[in-house]
């Protein structure tokens, strides 16, 4: 059986990437549509520079996805702040060429709720090495997402360079001048231009670009944008950003074939799940179970494919909730609980603009609803189609079998009993529940005989433990080896798969089907 992929009307790559760009805005604490506006400014600047259609296409996609790697940055910031989205949002007004501004931002946000001595240590560590760690994680994630989206080597390489600076003081590789790909250099100008335009209009944009000229930004690009700023920023307000960004796609639109759509759906699933070690592989697992249940209930091939697609993207809105909330072991406060309950609506929000994906967002937005109206949004039986009931039951079952910060994973038998109990209480339809449980019990795909990147079976085992968030010492206890041996394994794995962080390794494992099913 093959999965139907991202079902529905024909889908342009640009439309999918633009939707993902909206999700990266949420994950980065940035204003919604910042990525779209940034892409427009980048393309218009590129047109004025006389770039070719191929070069403009690279600029277009890099500007849309330039912060995709930073979607996981919040998991690092969550260690020093209770709301990393607010911290990231506050950084939008920081001039990257002004060291005082950067240090003031760190002092304002890092460890604000911690005791004085611990806060001093956090701030000192952030100033000393935190930026490099963030840059490495952003690079690894950007490279993996770029590969999963199959958008070409130039775009992938440029996405990995969006934190580099013209003067070589960026990271993670301290590239300098024209060592940095042109799309990344254009991205840096357009990125700050939109942010500072929101804060202070044309004057603020020109000021920040002039201060950073020759430091953060290529002088030629900064000078050209400063001359064009009144015209470009006025044009930015002339039509809705979504319509404008689709119209601005350089060259002929790229339409995605069914197998490409399925790959893109998995990329979105991985983007949603990567923010927490507790949810790695969750969305793909829900999609498989939900599709199997839909077929058992007699839904058409198209409808079953739609359920599968909605399963892949159902948790995209999690990116708009602080990582610290998802990793909390104590009971949530009322305000934290309200933010958690918003995430299905955020999924619907970021997909609503797309004519091709909007129907999936509507369905995915119902994945926490219950027949008795006790779900997150209070939608009850008459307004819940069978597809939504299937998705909700599949999500509930799969979540029960996964560990969470506040509890251990249930066994499959215990999870099945729980789900049947909820059906008896009127939360789920019993027939839907039985279909979901039957779908979950189907044999999985055979294990790979040849591992990707030349990984050994032992290395695959170590990788599986690492992406679940275990420390080297914890992995050593599980594997009955020394922590030093585990560290050797980790370094060999990183060398083989071409990453340098666990986040990058996690995305590699997801892409290559190495995430093992939980018991």
Give the predicted meaning of each segment.
Residues 3-454, 460:
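Histidine- and acidic-residue-rich, metal-dependent catalytic cores
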Residues 273, 464-468, 510:
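Short, locally clustered residues in the helix-turn-helix/winged-helix DNA-binding domain
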Residues 280, 463, 487:
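Conserved catalytic core of two-component sensor histidine kinases
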Residues 463-464, 474:
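Transmembrane alpha-helical segments of multi-pass transport proteins
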Residues 470-504, 508:
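Recognition helix of helix-turn-helix DNA-binding domains
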Residues 508-519:
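Intrinsically disordered, low-complexity basic tails/linkers immediately adjacent to helix-turn-helix/homeobox/MYB/SANT
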């Amino acid at each position: 059986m093959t999965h139907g992929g991202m079902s529905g009307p024909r889908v342009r790559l640009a439309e999918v990437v633009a939707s993902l760009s909206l999700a990266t805005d949420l994950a980065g604490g940035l204003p919604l549509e910042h990525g779209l506006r940034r892409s427009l400014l980048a393309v218009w600047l590129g047109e004025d520079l006389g770039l070719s259609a191929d070069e403009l296409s690279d600029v277009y996609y890099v500007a849309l996805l330039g912060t995709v790697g930073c979607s996981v940055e919040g998991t690092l910031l969550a260690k020093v702040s209770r709301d990393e989205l607010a911290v990231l949002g506050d950084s939008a007004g920081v001039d990257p060429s002004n060291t005082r501004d950067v240090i003031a931002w760190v002092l304002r946000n890092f460890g604000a709720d911690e005791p004085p001595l611990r806060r001093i240590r956090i701030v000192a560590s952030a100033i000393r090495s935190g930026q490099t760690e963030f840059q490495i994680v952003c690079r690894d994630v950007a490279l993996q997402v770029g590969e999963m989206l199959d958008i070409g080597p130039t775009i992938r390489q440029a996405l990995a360079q969006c934190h580099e600076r013209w003067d070589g003081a960026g990271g993670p590789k301290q590239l300098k001048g024209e060592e940095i790909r042109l799309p990344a250099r254009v991205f840096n100008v357009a990125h700050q231009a939109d942010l500072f335009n929101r804060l202070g209009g044309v004057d603020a944009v020109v000021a920040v670009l002039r201060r950073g000229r020759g430091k953060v930004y290529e002088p030629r690009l900064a000078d050209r944008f400063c001359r064009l700023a009144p015209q470009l920023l006025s044009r930015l307000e002339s039509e809705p950003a979504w319509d404008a960004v689709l119209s601005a796609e350089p060259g002929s639109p790229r339409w995605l074939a069914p197998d490409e759509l399925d790959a893109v759906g998995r990329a979105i699933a991985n983007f949603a799940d990567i923010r927490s070690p507790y949810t790695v592989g969750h969305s793909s697992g829900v999609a498989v179970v939900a599709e199997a249940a839909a077929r058992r209930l007699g839904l058409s091939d198209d409808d079953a494919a739609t359920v599968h697609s909605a399963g892949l993207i159902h948790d995209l809105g999690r990116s708009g909730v602080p990582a610290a909330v998802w990793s909390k072991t104590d009971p949530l406060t009322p305000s934290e609980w309200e933010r958690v309950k918003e995430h299905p609506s955020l999924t619907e929000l970021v997909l609503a603009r797309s004519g091709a994906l909007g129907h999936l967002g509507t369905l995915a937005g119902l994945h926490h609803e219950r027949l008795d109206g006790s779900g997150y949004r209070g939608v009850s039986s008459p307004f819940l189609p069978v597809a939504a009931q299937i998705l909700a039951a599949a999500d509930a079952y799969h979540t029960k079998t996964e560990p969470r910060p506040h509890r251990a994973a249930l066994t499959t038998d215990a999870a099945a009993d729980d789900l049947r109990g909820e059906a008896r209480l009127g939360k789920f339809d019993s027939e839907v529940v039985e279909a979901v449980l039957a779908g979950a019990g189907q044999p999985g795909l055979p294990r790979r005989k040849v591992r990707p990147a030349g990984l050994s079976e032992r290395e695959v085992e170590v990788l599986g433990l690492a992406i679940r968030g275990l420390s080297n010492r914890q992995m050593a206890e599980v594997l009955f080896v020394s922590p030093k041996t585990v560290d050797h394994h980790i370094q060999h794995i990183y060398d083989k798969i071409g990453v340098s962080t666990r986040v990058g390794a996690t995305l590699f494992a997801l892409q290559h089907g190495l995430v093992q099913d939980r018991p």
